[in-house]
């Protein structure tokens, strides 16, 4: 499970999902990504590579926000088949960044292309979960996940950015999706 920008593995619904997955027999890794307040593609992808080791068809990924981007960029580099991915508040656009610093940090994540064909060769089980009132991720990105990744998409209501600020401490849709795609 890969947390988001300025996040950590103890944020929001991460502890709950980890516990629920472990109850269902999953071995769950929730690394604290390097310098979460200033995520860099190469640092995060390389860190994930070290943490995961050699993935296989029984490896599943869950990402939140920029953690989704990290997983996509990881998969395009390793090109190894995995079980599937659940992306929560994943994005390709961030139109509401407020500061120049935020825009500078986000720029490479938004401008460097992802090889979607390589990602799709790794798995055909991709589910992306969005909220209809996310202040950061435009709901239109749902269509981009469907188009570029053949992702199944779920739209939750009133979940904001699925963060502590939105008060989201449990996320049954992520759990149920992961249990479903891992059958």
Give residue ranges: language-model regions.
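Residue in the alpha/beta-hydrolase core beta-strand immediately N-terminal to the catalytic nucleophile
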Residues: 60, 83-86
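Active-site nucleophile elbow and catalytic-triad environment of alpha/beta-hydrolase enzymes
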Residues: 100-118
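C-terminal catalytic histidine-bearing segment of alpha/beta-hydrolase fold enzymes
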Residues: 151-183
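Active-site nucleophile loop of the alpha/beta-hydrolase fold
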Residues: 4, 33-36, 86-96
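Gly/Ala-rich beta-loop-alpha elbow adjacent to hydrolase catalytic centers
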Residues: 61-71
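Conserved alpha/beta-hydrolase "acid-adjacent" motif
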Residues: 135-141
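Active-site catalytic motif of lipid deacylating hydrolases and related acyltransferases
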Residues: 1-57
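Short beta-strand/loop motif that positions the catalytic acidic residue
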Residues: 122-123, 127-130, 134
């Amino acid at each position: 499970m890969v947390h988001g920008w300025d996040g950590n593995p103890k944020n929001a619904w991460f502890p709950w999902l980890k516990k629920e997955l472990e109850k269902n027999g999953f071995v769950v890794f929730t690394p604290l990504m390097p310098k979460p307040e200033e995520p860099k593609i190469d640092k995060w992808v390389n860190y994930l590579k070290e943490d995961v080791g050699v993935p296989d068809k029984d490896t599943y990924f869950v990402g939140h926000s920029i953690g989704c981007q990290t997983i996509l960029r990881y998969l395009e580099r390793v090109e190894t088949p995995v079980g599937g991915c659940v992306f929560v508040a994943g994005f390709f656009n961030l139109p509401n960044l407020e500061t120049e610093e935020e825009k500078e940090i986000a720029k490479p994540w938004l401008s460097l292309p992802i090889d979607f064909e390589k990602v799709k060769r790794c798995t055909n089980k991709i589910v992306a979960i969005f909220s209809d009132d996310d202040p950061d991720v435009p709901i239109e990105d749902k269509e981009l996940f469907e188009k570029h990744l053949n992702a199944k998409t779920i739209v939750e209501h009133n979940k904001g950015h699925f963060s502590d600020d939105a008060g989201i401490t449990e996320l049954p849709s992520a759990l149920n999706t992961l249990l479903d795609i891992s059958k």
